[in-house]
Amino acid sequence: MIEQLIQQAQPYWQQYIEHEFVQQLAKGTLPKACFQHYLKQDYLYLFHYSRAFALGVFKAKNFAEMETPRKTLEILCQEIQLHLNYCREWGISEQEIFTTQESAACIAYTRYLLDCGMTGSLAELYAAVTPCALGYAQVARYITQHYPRLPNNPYQTWIDTYASEEFQQAAQETVDFLTALCKPLNPSQLAEIQQIFTTATRMEIAFWQMGLDLA
């Protein structure tokens, strides 16, 4: 299922995984200001991303379905402090983060996620959130497989976080849940799933570009 979604989302998926932002991260050449801008916007993104999983709990039809988005939401809420700590290491105070204005790319992407969650099924919501989870897992694998590990890469901690077995497993669980949700769907419903997945992938490209452009 996921292979088909990715294939049908080309060329956008490859542009997402191999974006210039990603390549500069891998080489350690990304300007510090670009990464700081990305980190601040990512915090704002994660707030709305968490809200999307809260909608997933609401959309669930039974306790079994509820468990996956509930677990993800709990992890996100626990780890947001780690994100704030990481931002502090990059010279970004909590006050600066809390007063940062959302970029146009962040608004477009997060409101699209929430719209899918508000108006669509649980499967449609997961079609919207899966490109983020799976994509970051694939980005980390792409970097580790195609670029040498540099001893002084300032972005190595970021790379290691998403290359970790824990994150890779969490991404796979998201994929597996989406696959299960899609099994009973008819061709028309699956076409909508594809459209959402592809659109969210395009939004991810725009988010990387926002970081590069300091937009």
Swiss-Prot record:
Database matches in Pfam families: TENA_THI-4
PANTHER family: BIFUNCTIONAL TH2 PROTEIN, SI:CH1073-67J19.1-RELATED
Protein name in the entry: Uncharacterized protein HI_0358
Listed InterPro entries: Haem_Oase-like_multi-hlx (IPR016084), Thiaminase-2/PQQC (IPR004305), Thiaminase_II (IPR027574), Thiamine_Salvage_TenA (IPR050967)
Assigned protein family: Belongs to the thiaminase-2 family.
Superkingdom as given in the UniProt entry: Bacteria
One MF term in the entry's GO annotations: thiaminase activity
Protein source organism: Haemophilus influenzae (strain ATCC 51907 / DSM 11121 / KW20 / Rd)
GO CC annotation terms, alphabetical: cytosol
